[in-house]
């Protein structure tokens, strides 16, 4: 995932700044596997609950019972990281405050499941697998609860639940389930073939080069898929699959299977790109924005010969092409297609009307915006 990704000029999805409010005790569970400096080993209890050595923790003590490690947040903005102990992958550390120090330690072999509930407040919780992967063998669910939460997944089958609030969910490299909940959420699946249920609100799902083929359910609200291209030539195709949108990128053999997504933003970036928008009737997509700028957030083209192809239907179509120096718009079909930052010297917009008695009206397109073709014939 990029450090910063522009979302409609205002919002960003970024790696979480993560750490759960306050300092808790260091405890050993499931044996005497190491101690914190200045402390003795904690007693081992049959219910595997961690012993508390200090009392000033805002995050409730993690509880390990019957193989489930349960971590409950507070009504404040909590910060938490989970990681394996460096040099000793048999120990799972709970870092309250995400300050790099372990506040609780548990024998990894005793854990079959992890559940984190951030509670109220704007929480930041992340899976830190820099010392090794553990979510591939331990089922892990991280819930933000109420508040604007920042949740980061891992390399295994992690479930991230935003809950209420405008949340940021960032998956890891694994095959994850990302649940936005209520609020306007920003969701980035990152690696792996993820499933995102974006929930209520006006949500945005972000895809970057290197990510997997994902399933998106926009659900309620006006939702956006933001797909960032790479610096080289790409071939992208948008088509209807029943009531679902199939967004295919040839490079990497990426297929995005979406429903309930009303807007698609594609940042083509560098290279001679080909973007084909087929008839999207039956889907929820009403707007497709294709940005031909050479950089994210830029206003200048990439200097390459880009092609945008818009295919009509087999019925009688009335298509309009409008625009000025900054953009061209194709309307009259199921989805309005906006071509942003075209270069008249390099880029071309092709309209294929297919069967039926069709009309293409380009009277609203200013000169010098983009090369326009209708059924292979250049239009002045």
Language-model segments: residues:
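Acidic, glycine-rich low-complexity segments
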Residues: 37-380
